[in-house]
Each structure stands twice: as structure tokens, then as C-alpha cells.
Amino acid sequence: MAFPLKDDLGRAKDCWGCSSDTPALSTCSNADIFRRINAMLDNSLDFTGVCTTPNTKGKCEHLQDYPDTEGAAASRMLFSTSHEPLPRGLPDTNDLCLGLQSLSLTGWDRPWSTQDSEAGGQSSTPTAAQSVFSMLNSPMGKPSPLGFLPLDPIGSDLVEKYPTHLLRSSRFDSRSILDSRSSSPSDSDTSGFSSGSDHLSDLISSLRISPPLPFLPLGSGISRDPLRLGVGSRLDQDHAALAAATASPLGITKRWPGTSVWPSWDLLDSADDPFSIEREARLHRQAAAVNEATCTWSGQLPPRNYKNPVYSCKVFLGGVPWDITETGLINTFRVFGALSVEWPGKDGKHPRCPPKGNMPKGYVYLVFESEKSVRALLQACTQDLLSQDGLSEHYFKMSSRRMRCKEVQVIPWVLADSNFVRSPSQRLDPSKTVFVGALHGMLNAEALASIMNDLFGGVVYAGIDTDKHKYPIGSGRVTFNNQRSYLKAVSAAFVEIKTAKFTKKVQIDPYLEDSVCQVCNAQPGPFFCRDQVCFKYFCRSCWHWQHSMEILRHHRPLMRNQKSRDSS
């Protein structure tokens, strides 16, 4: 059954109110597509009032019957970014939306209209032919005739109208709306047209329509005009509805737009090496060896005046003969008391056997059972007093099978050198504490505090990390009384210390504590990013998520040294 367009006098009318003698709507570029659509609908459409051949001789002058109101002008500017009124007259078919968006989304021709209450009591669905005719018989800017079924506004019941996989997009794209299928029941009047076959969808997608509705960035400082304000506010509500209706946040993030600066959770699922963070953290501990110092301290270390010092039971033995054995060491030093030997190993560990076929690295550690044994050993050593610094070096002569009377250096540790407090009443704040690594063995807590105070100021405490025998392990902590000094020290990162006896480059990092992840606040946060852009604790997943961004990939993680935690 055909549905001709007739006026009150029985004459065929086009959609602009013109007689059939002068076709008002030139659809020549889409004529073939309209004919094929009509054929698929069993010729239920009548295009009597629609031009199918080019016509440039005349234009409809009956537009003056409908005065240009502000709403009418705005309706013609639906996709225009300019505020200037369009010239009066018939627009080109490429500029007209032709209502084709209504095939996939109701209310496209009136997106800014508030029709919620208007359409609340009506539930009937227009037929396929009526949908096409409404697009031709209701010009934009012309009031709808009485009895016209109000269309739903954009965004109403989106969750019900569109499949879930289309809604899981972080950006409300008009292209996805046009490409989506209707959710009308299969037995409804519009099911065959709206859902249709793939061939029909291809025909509709071939039609030339105007550009999609431009979206204003949310949260931007650009003010919206009254026309766009309605659209934007409705879209803002739709964004909130979509976020609430989406079952899994993971589905949203996996479909994040490619232009977003935020990373995708897909990177978490495809981590090549789950222990890459630990490896980078271990490498960072030796960063002082490959990085240049940002500042240098040179001077004289504070003098040491000990009264009845107490020593660690562990001593360092440097310059030992290369062919020395553990048996030879025990036989040489057991005259001072019972002892054991710790050989240097990888990662600062000290196994109880010589490495690689009894070949030592030139130094070992002796661990006596009593502190009195250390005192006896030092009394048997020769001392070289170091002028000005008040330091003294201890040397002991020993022999091996191939070396006779070899002098080895004995370096003890005074327990009082492990901590230095400048202000006993000052509360120590871990958030203003730095970790100092790669310390020289001659640096005690007082010397470390003096150097850091000269460089950054505000030092209230310095401590040297020790093992279970209370012997230093080459790292320390410094606490400041203000945030500025703390940040200056962290920013310095690498400091070179020059004295008359040694030159050493130390490494400064934030002091780490046991903390929860400061991103998700759910998992433990063993990884810390020292870059000022982040400067927080992360769990493994949150670290990969944040640092998968290209601008943050160069950040290196920090981890607490398990050995220092157990020993100090």
C-alpha cells in the first residue's frame, strides 16, 4: 500500500509545502538508494513528491508561510558551529540531515527538546513507512502537525535501546549510534526495517548525511550557548547513566579511545615479565656507579673521640693474601677467641665458604663470639694515626703458604657510631627521611649528618644501617626537620663526598616504609616511584597501569632492601 502525500485540495505536496510541479527536495544523489530501499519494503513508499532527477530551474517560495523563528533557524544549524543565520531558501540535500538518523535513533531532529513528560503516556511505535514519511514530511524548523507522535529525546532508555557492547565506550560517539541496531521486538512493525538485513544496513550507511553532532569536552572552560547547553546537559546525564549501567569497569577501560593519554588495562594482562619491577629496583640500588653526581661535598670529617668504646663482634679484614683459606684464617686469629669466617658473596651476602674454588676476593669478615676478642685483636694491631681527622687505621701481620708477613687491614665498628641525634627532643618524621646508599666504611652517623646538613640543612638525625652483628652494611638514613630540605636531598639523588682519605659517590632516595598502594588503597604497595610526578607507593597492578603511559615509562621503581630490613 502506498502512502501519497496530499494537501487539503488533493494535490500531491512535497515535504516543504510546494506543489508537485516544483519538487522541493532534491534527492538525486540518493535516488537509487531510495528506490532500492522501497523495493525491499515491497514498494510501500510513494516518492511522488520527491525529485529523482536534477532540477535547478526553480525553488520553493512557500517558505514564507512559516516565518523564521529562532527555533527554526537553530534547527537548521544543528551541525553548524557558527552563530550566523543561514540564508533563506532551500538547503542542499547534503546539508539536510533528511531524518535518516531517526532510523536508528528517535528524536534526532529535536535533540534539545525536553519531551520526557510529553511522550510519557504514548507507547505506540510508528511503522517503517511512517518513519520514512515523517522524515520527508516534517521539515526542520517547521512545527509538527497536530497528532504527531512525539519522539523520545536523545539518551532516554539508552541501556534498553542499544546492545551492551556498544555502551561500553568511554566516549558517546554518534557513529556508533548510527551503526547500532534497534532493539524493537522481532514481531513489531519496525523490526524488519530497523533491524533489517546487512544489505539494507549497507544501503543506509551509503546515504550522504550531515556530520555528526559535535561534542563539547566535559569540564572545559568553554561556555555553551543555549542551544548546545541542552544537548550537553542531556549528554552529561547519559554519560552518568552509561557509567552506572555498565557491569564491569574493565570493559570501559579496554575500549578507551586511542587518543586518550591514559593507558589501557590490556597492558596489565599482557605483562611480559611479572618480575620486571623487582629487577629494575635492584638495578637502581647500584645507580650511583653509573650516574653523575649533581653536587659535591669536600672537607674534613668531624674528629672522633671515644671513651671506652664498645665494638661490634664483627670486623672487616682487607688485603688478605689471595691464597688464604678458611682454615688458615681460623688458625691465625683463634688466639683472640672463638670465631667464624664470612666470605663475600653476591648481593652483599656472606657465605661461609670461599667463592670459586677457594679463591677469595681480597677481603673477608671475621665474626667473633665475644666483643672482648675484638678488643684483643685491636691491641695486637699496629696503628697508623690519621692527622686532623682523629682516625686511626689498624694493621695486622699474617702469613699464608705463598705469602709471608702480609699486612692486612682490620676495620672494627664502634656501636656509638651507628646513630647521631642533633636534637633529642625533635620528633623524627619518616616522611622527611631519606635513604643514603653506597656509603664508605669510614663514614659514621655524625659525619653523615654533618655532610647532609652542610648541603641541604635541617638535619636532626642520621643513622647507619647495620646487620645482625651490628656492623654497617653500607647504607644509612637522614631525617630533616622541614620538607624543603628533604625535597632538596631527594632531588640531588647523587652526591660526591671528597675527603683527604677517600672519595665516594653516595645515592639518596626517599626512605621507604611498609605502605598500602596509594592508588587503589586495597593492596600492599611495595613499589615506590621517586619521580615528583608520582611520588607514591604502588602495588604491582597499579604500577603497570600508571607507568604504561609513554611519558611515565622512564620512571624507575624503588623497593625496600629486605636485607637491611632484617638486619637493622
Curated annotation (Swiss-Prot):
One matching Pfam family: CEBP_ZZ
Keyword vocabulary terms for this entry: Activator, Cytoplasm, Cytoskeleton, Membrane, Metal-binding, mRNA processing, Phosphoprotein, Repeat, Repressor, Ribonucleoprotein, RNA-binding, Translation regulation, Ubl conjugation, Zinc
Residue ranges of the region described as Necessary for interaction with microtubules and localization at the mitotic apparatus: 172-175, 182-191
Primary site of residence: cytoplasm
Record note on modification: Ser-174 phosphorylation by aurka in immature oocytes is essential to trigger CPE-containing mRNA cytoplasmic polyadenylation and translation activation and the subsequent signaling events that result in meiotic progression. Ser-174 phosphorylation recruits the cleavage and polyadenylation specificity factor (cpsf1) into an active cytoplasmic polyadenylation complex. Ser-174 phosphorylation increases its affinity for cpsf1 and papd4/gld2. Heavily phosphorylated by CDK1 on serines late during oocyte maturation. Ser-210 phosphorylation is sufficient to target cpeb1 for degradation. Ubiquitinated. Requires a PEST box and the proteasome pathway for destruction during oocyte maturation. Ser-210 phosphorylation triggers its destruction, an event important to allow the transition from metaphase I to metaphase II and cytokinesis in the early embryo.
GO MF annotation list: metal ion binding; mRNA 3'-UTR AU-rich region binding; mRNA 3'-UTR binding; mRNA regulatory element binding translation repressor activity; ribosome binding; translation factor activity, RNA binding
Subunit record text: Found in a complex with cpeb1, tacc3/maskin and eif4e; dissolution of this complex results in the binding of eif4e to eif4g and the translational activation of CPE-containing mRNAs. Found in a complex with cpeb1, cpsf1, the cytoplasmic poly(A) polymerase papd4/gld2 and sympk. Found in a mRNP complex with cpeb1, a guanine exchange factor xgef and mos mRNA. Interacts with cpsf1, papd4/gld2, tacc3/maskin, microtubules, sympk and xgef. Component of a ribonucleoprotein (RNP) complex, at least composed of cpeb1, lsm14b/rap55b, ddx6/Xp54, ybx2/frgy2, pat1/P100, eif4enif1/4E-T and eif4e1b.
Name of protein: Cytoplasmic polyadenylation element-binding protein 1-B
Organism encoding this protein: Xenopus laevis
Native organism taxonomy: Eukaryota, Metazoa, Chordata, Craniata, Vertebrata
Gene behind this protein: cpeb1-b
